[in-house]
Amino acid sequence: MEKAEAAAVVIPLSVSNPSYRGSGMSDQEVSEEQSAGDAWVSAAMAAAEAVAAAATSTGIDNTNDYTYTAASENGDPGFTLGDNTYGPNGAASGCPSPPSPEVVGLEMVVVSSLAPEIAAAVPADTIFASAAAPATRVDDGNAPLLGPGQAQDYDSESGCYYSESDNETASMFIRRVGRRQARRHRRRRVALTVAGVILVVVLCAISGIVGAFLARVFP
């Protein structure tokens, strides 16, 4: 199908800018220049109407019947207009085919390229086992629920674990830490008491042995 093309029409500067005045031009010359510009505008409009009439008479439904890919200023891929994208009345006669993942963006490409590395780093059976493993409690039940991977990171001696869940408030945490410190102090007191008793018993035994030895040496 042949395309109807309009001849290039050159519009002088005075038409695009009516207030333009060349150097040394009188008022009469300016009015003559504007009259000539009006003639050029009329000729251009007549040529455009002739092109539109020719396109209608030859049955051209879409003057953009060639494939054109528009790209944005930042280099992103644009859209494609193909044959019969628009009907004779200017409305869309059909939807273009969906763009490929490369056109949409790099998200799908990046995810697909990293999938083997993710599978190699974290095996699927490990993920399923971690998800199916029940939650465990550490300490004596006062600590919040911990998963299998979190139990080894919990420091029961320092007692400075903050729960990541929303079921433990600040007051609950303070009470839990206070109970742990009280138990630690109580165990320390018991240990010191036992150590003192043992030390007294050992000293008594040593003194008895020394007394018996001295009694035998010095009758």
Swiss-Prot record:
| Acidic, as annotated region | 153-168
Biological process, per Gene Ontology: intracellular transport of virus
TM stretches of this protein: 194-214
How does it get modified post-translation?
A: Phosphorylated on serines within the acidic cluster. Phosphorylation determines whether endocytosed viral US9 traffics to the trans-Golgi network or recycles to the cell membrane.
Q: Which residues lie on this side of the membrane: Virion surface?
A: 215-219
Q: Which residues carry this modification: Phosphoserine?
A: 163, 165
Q: Which GO terms describe its cellular component?
A: host cell; host cell Golgi membrane; host cell plasma membrane; host cell smooth endoplasmic reticulum membrane; membrane; viral envelope; virion membrane
* The entry's keywords: Host cell membrane, Host endoplasmic reticulum, Host Golgi apparatus, Host membrane, Membrane, Phosphoprotein, Signal-anchor, Transmembrane, Transmembrane helix, Viral envelope protein, Virion
Sequence motif: Di-leucine internalization motif, positions: 145-146
Q: Which family does it belong to?
A: Belongs to the alphaherpesvirinae envelope protein US9 family.
Protein name, UniProt field: Envelope protein US9 homolog
Q: Which organism is it from?
A: Equine herpesvirus 1 (strain Ab4p) (EHV-1)
